[in-house]
C-alpha cells in the first residue's frame, strides 16, 4: 500500500518539499540559514500578532501602550523583546544567507535570486516601519529622516514625501499607516517565501563544490531535518540569551524617551542592521547621489549574475576570489561601525573610503580576479 504522504494532494506537496526532497549530500551548515529565516519569520509573526492585540497606533498613546505591554500584560515584556531582538536575529541570518549565495554562486539560479532580493527589500521595509511604532525619539526622527530622503527625487519628491506622511510632517496619519503596513507585509513576505522555494525546487539546491550533484543525493528527511532542527535550537538559544540577559544591547537608549518633534537627538541613526547602508548614504555630500548610492548598495545584488566571469561556479577552489569576498565582509562591518559614529573627522573619510571600496570590489575587482583565475587554470 502506498504511503498517504505520497498520494494525498496536500501532503504530497509537503512530502516533496520537506521529506523526500533530494538534496546534494555535500551541502554544509551554510545551507541552514534558509530554515533559520523561516523560523525567524514564524517567531516574528507570532510575537507581532500578540503585540498588536495590545498596541495602539495613535501618537498620544503609542509610547504608553508599549510601556503597558511591558509592565501590565502577562509576559508582555518577553513578547516585546523577542520581537525586537528577533528582528536582529532575522537580519543576521539574512545577511549570512545572502553571503552564502555570493560565495557559492547560488545567484546563478536567477529566479530564486531575484525573488530573494525582493524579499530582502520587503524585510527591510517591514523592519523600518516596525522601528517607528514604539514612538520614541529615535522612532520619530528615524522616520522623519529616512522618509525625507524621497524628497531628493526630482519634480515629485516633495509631493511624494507628504503623500507618505499623510500631512506636512510625521504624525498620527503616518504612524497609523506604518502600523497597517507593518502588520500586512510579513504575510506578503510569507507568500514570497513560498514562491522563493517554488523556484528553488525547480532547479534543486546548489552545493559547495558547484558541480552537478545529481548522482549523489540524500533525502531531506531525516538528514537535513535533524540538521535544521539543531540550527533552529541554536538560534533560539542565542535569541533567548539576548532577550533574557541583555534585551537592550542592540537597541537605542533614545527610544526610551517619548517622541518630541521639538527636540532633535544629537545623533540620528537607524537600527544596527541598516547602518552599513546609512554609512554609504552619508558618505556622499549630494542628497540625490546619497539616495541613489543607498538604493544601489542593495540593488547591486541584482546584477551580480551578469558580473560572474569565472569558469567555476563557487569560490571553493578560488583563493583569490575568497580573499576579495572576506575583504567585502570586513568592509561591510567597517561601514556598519561608521554608520553608528557621528559625522566628524576621521569617520567621514573612513566612510567614504569604505563606500568606494564596497562598489569597487563588487563591480570591478571580483570580475577581474575571476578572469585572472580562469587564465591561471591554463597553467
Curated annotation (Swiss-Prot):
InterPro entries: Cyt_b/b6_C, Cyt_b/b6_C_sf, Cyt_b/b6_N, Cytb/b6-like_sf, Cytochrome_b, Cytochrome_b_C_euk/bac, Cytochrome_b_N_euk/bac, Di-haem_cyt_TM
Pfam families: Cytochrom_B_C, Cytochrome_B
This protein's GO CC annotations: mitochondrial inner membrane; respiratory chain complex III
List of residues binding a ubiquinone: 201
Molecular function (Gene Ontology), one example: metal ion binding
Cofactor (UniProt): heme b
Any one GO biological process: mitochondrial electron transport, ubiquinol to cytochrome c
SUPFAM superfamilies given in the database record: a domain/subunit of cytochrome bc1 complex (Ubiquinol-cytochrome c reductase), Transmembrane di-heme cytochromes
Similarity remark: Belongs to the cytochrome b family.
Subunit: The cytochrome bc1 complex contains 11 subunits: 3 respiratory subunits (MT-CYB, CYC1 and UQCRFS1), 2 core proteins (UQCRC1 and UQCRC2) and 6 low-molecular weight proteins (UQCRH/QCR6, UQCRB/QCR7, UQCRQ/QCR8, UQCR10/QCR9, UQCR11/QCR10 and a cleavage product of UQCRFS1). This cytochrome bc1 complex then forms a dimer.
Note: Heme 1 (or BL or b562) is low-potential and absorbs at about 562 nm, and heme 2 (or BH or b566) is high-potential and absorbs at about 566 nm.
Known function: Component of the ubiquinol-cytochrome c reductase complex (complex III or cytochrome b-c1 complex) that is part of the mitochondrial respiratory chain. The b-c1 complex mediates electron transfer from ubiquinol to cytochrome c. Contributes to the generation of a proton gradient across the mitochondrial membrane that is then used for ATP synthesis.
Record protein name field: Cytochrome b
High-level lineage: Eukaryota, Metazoa, Chordata, Craniata, Vertebrata
